[in-house]
Structure formats: C-alpha cells, structure tokens
Amino acid sequence: MAAPGWGRWVLGLGPLLLQVFLPFQLVAGRWGPEGAGGGVRRGLAEPSVVAKHEDSLFKDLFQDYERWVRPVEHLNDRIKIKFGLAISQLVDVDEKNQLMTTNVWLKQEWIDVKLRWNPDDYGGIKLIRVPSDSLWTPDIVLFDNADGRFEGASTKTVVRYDGTVTWTPPANYKSSCTIDVTFFPFDLQNCSMKFGSWTYDGSQVDIILEDQDVDKRDFFDNGEWEIVSATGSKGNRTDSCCWYPYITYSFVIKRLPLFYTLFLIIPCIGLSFLTVLVFYLPSNEGEKICLCTSVLVSLTVFLLVIEEIIPSSSKVIPLIGEYLVFTMIFVTLSIMVTVFAINIHHRSSSTHDAMAPWVRKIFLHKLPKLLCMRSHVDRYFSQKEEARSSRGPRSSRNALEAALDSVRYITRHVMKETDVREVVEDWKFIAQVLDRMFLWTFLLVSVVGSLGLFVPVIYKWANIIVPIHIGNENK
C-alpha cells in the first residue's frame, strides 16, 4: 500500500517542480551564451554604442550652447540664410475680408559654426536631428500676416557635421491680399507674401533666394482657384542706418469661372432675354406686368447673392454687378413701356380725344411696314369704301330717305358703332405696333449689352492665361 501512496505523492509534486525549474531554464536559455536569444542580445550592443556616441555628441555640442546668440565666429560676420518656399495647398481666398489662406513649407538653410564635429570621433555620425527650440534659428516671419501668427511651427532641424542646419517648418498663413473684383468672375488676382527677419538687419542676417519659383510638386488643387504663376524676388528696405533684406513671393491666381457661369451669369442672361418676351404677350393679358415684376425680383435676389461674395467697395463695380444693374434698368423700362402699351390698348373715343393725324400716319402706315406687320389700314379700307359707296345711292334718293327715317336712324346708329369700333381697333393696333417695336429694340439692346460686357473681358482673360500657361510648359 506504501508504493502506490508514494507514487501519488511524486505525481502531485511534478507540477510544482515544473513551475519552479521551467522559468529558470527559459531565463538561462535566453541570456546564456548558448541560448537562442544570445545572438540578439549581442546584436543590440552596436546600436547601444551608436546611441552613446550620439548622446556624447549632443552633450559636447549643447553643453555651452546659447541659442539666443548668433552662431558666428566674429561679431561682424554675417549669416546667410538660403530661403525657399513650397506650397502644399491654397486653402481659401476670402474676397469679402481680402485674405488668402495657404499651407506652406518654409525652406531655410544656414551655417552654424558652433555645431561642427568630426564624424570619426562620434562613430561616423554625420547628421543629427535637433528640436528648433534648442538652437539658434532666424526670426523670419511673414510681414503681411492677417491673423497674428507670424512664425511657422516648431519642428526639428537637420544638422550636418559641417554645421549646415536645414529647417523646413510647415505653416498655415492668412495673408492680406488686395482683391480686385472688376472682372468677377473672370478675374485674376495678384497676392504677395513678404518674408523677412523681424529684428536682424542685412549686416547680421542676409536672406538669399534659393529658387525663383515656388515649389509646387506637392500642391493640392483648389476647386475654385488655380495658381497661374508663383515667383519670388529679393528686395531691400533701407532706413537711416541699416538695410533690411526681404523675399517677396507673388502668386498670380485665376478664378475658375465655370460654377459662377452656370449658376449666376447664365440665369441672369436668361432673365434678361425673358424680359424681351414680355412684349410678345398680347396687351390684353394681365400677366405682362406680373412677368416683368417677377424678373425684377429675381434680379434683386441675384444682386443680394453677389453682394455677399464681393467686398464692399466703392472703388470698383464688378462686371456681373454692372450687368445686373443694366438688366434691372432694362426690366424697369420694360415695365414702364408695358404700362404705356396697356394704356394705349384700352383707349377708345369715349375716353380719349380723336387720334392725331401724325400718330395715325406713323403708327398705322409707316411703322407696320418697317416691322413686317400687316397694315391695319388695309384690313378696314375695303369696309370703309363699301360704306362710302353705299352712302351715294342713299343720298341721291331724298324722297325715299324722308319716308324711311327709321331706317336712316338705324343706319346712322350702326355706322356710329362701326366708327367707334374702328377707333378702338386702331388703338389696339397701335399697342401691337408698340409691342413689336419694343420687342426688337429690347432684343437688340439685350444682345449688344451682353456681348459688349462679357466678350471683351473673356477675350482679355483668355489672352492673359494662354501665354502664361505656354511659358510654364516651356519651363
């Protein structure tokens, strides 16, 4: 009975022994010279040495480094800053507030004589990355900033063993831009960004333009604006004692007018030509005034929409604004003419005096022929001649007329009604002549006005854009 009990005791002790000795074996196998992980541990020794060299390099470089002092050997030495600009996105152009928002990278490179070392003394390290807050950086800012943020982001710099420091911080700028909306929406804008040192003059820090063209390799297109050209130039501002260098980048941007053409210009032109159709409606239709009033209200709404887009300035009036004002005057005149034509249409001998001879001559004889209308006189001439011919025989029969007074009375009454009806028809025909005359007049004015306003601007816009694109392709 003892043997089986001893066996159960050994079996119960087995798991305990595994829990004690197995971790020890794993640790021994991992860290021992024969373990599987021994090679990995020995492989980490080399990066550790590199890290020690880099730590030693940082300590030697920045132990006595003062980042507020210009890194020059002599006080009169000048630091030359190679400056370049790369644009990643044209975020927005705010015409109302006259601002241009951009995302850019500021490329800056200079020599820091305090950050030089021999790579052989530090394990072959040729460059290090240092936070920009830990070393001297030029205080180059955007002068024409509009939101109070004059500097870029605080990012790391790349320092080479020969002292060359490269710093490319990203920045989001809102720069002031004078917007000229004269040819809106076929407008080109010239917005500039002026960079320079905030405190150093040219004898201490000189700015050198690295590349005349702005780097647009990583540019993300904007849906409303297109950059036609972006070039930089160097300038100097001189005062009584010193000179201050600066770099100015000029961005020539053009608006993509398709959206405004489809949803603003074409509806305005359509409303303008819709006004012409008012004169095609009969004068006895009351919808003529309603149509004119509806067009006028629609133009007012378009004018309010444009007022929200363009800046409030009395110096220039945008092209589309001129066209809307022209169309509103056009519609107002059409309302006045329509009211006059309706008044003419409803005239009669009982409400107005007899028609003047010159009115009858011009509007019943001459204008209908010029307007390719059938003459109103021709329609009633045969009836009048028949009436006159019928009066002759009746007048020659005096005896019969005396006997037939009642018939004569009826005849005179019928003739009077006929004359009254003819007078009414004459006035209605004059109203038709006026409608036809104003139809062609307003159509001609609308076509000439639309072409006169938009064609020269589009032609000029196309002639400016095409040579610039050809020049950019040649580059």
Curated annotation (Swiss-Prot):
Activity regulation as described: Activated by a myriad of ligands such as acetylcholine, cytisine, nicotine, choline and epibatidine.
Gene Ontology cellular component terms for the protein in this record: acetylcholine-gated channel complex; cation channel complex; cholinergic synapse; dopaminergic synapse; neuron projection; neurotransmitter receptor complex; plasma membrane; postsynaptic membrane
Pfam family, one: Neur_chan_LBD
SUPFAM superfamilies in the cross-refs: Neurotransmitter-gated ion-channel transmembrane pore, Nicotinic receptor ligand binding domain-like
Listed GO MF terms: acetylcholine receptor activity; acetylcholine-gated monoatomic cation-selective channel activity
InterPro entries: Neur_chan_lig-bd, Neur_chan_lig-bd_sf, Neur_channel, Neuro-gated_channel_TM_sf, Neuro_actylchol_rec, Neurotrans-gated_channel_TM, Neurotransmitter_ion_chnl_CS, Nicotinic_acetylcholine_rcpt
GO BP terms in the entry: acetylcholine receptor signaling pathway; behavioral response to nicotine; membrane depolarization; monoatomic ion transmembrane transport; neuromuscular synaptic transmission; presynaptic modulation of chemical synaptic transmission; response to nicotine; synaptic transmission, cholinergic
Assembly description: Neuronal AChR that forms heteropentamers composed of two different type of subunits: alpha and non-alpha (beta). CHRNA5/alpha-5 subunit is only able to form functional nAChRs when co-assembled with another alpha subunit, can be combined to CHRNA4/alpha-4 or CHRNA3/alpha-3 and CHRNB4/beta-4 or CHRNB2/beta-2 to give rise to functional receptors. Interacts with LYPD6.
Protein's recorded name: Neuronal acetylcholine receptor subunit alpha-5
Organism: Bos taurus (Bovine)
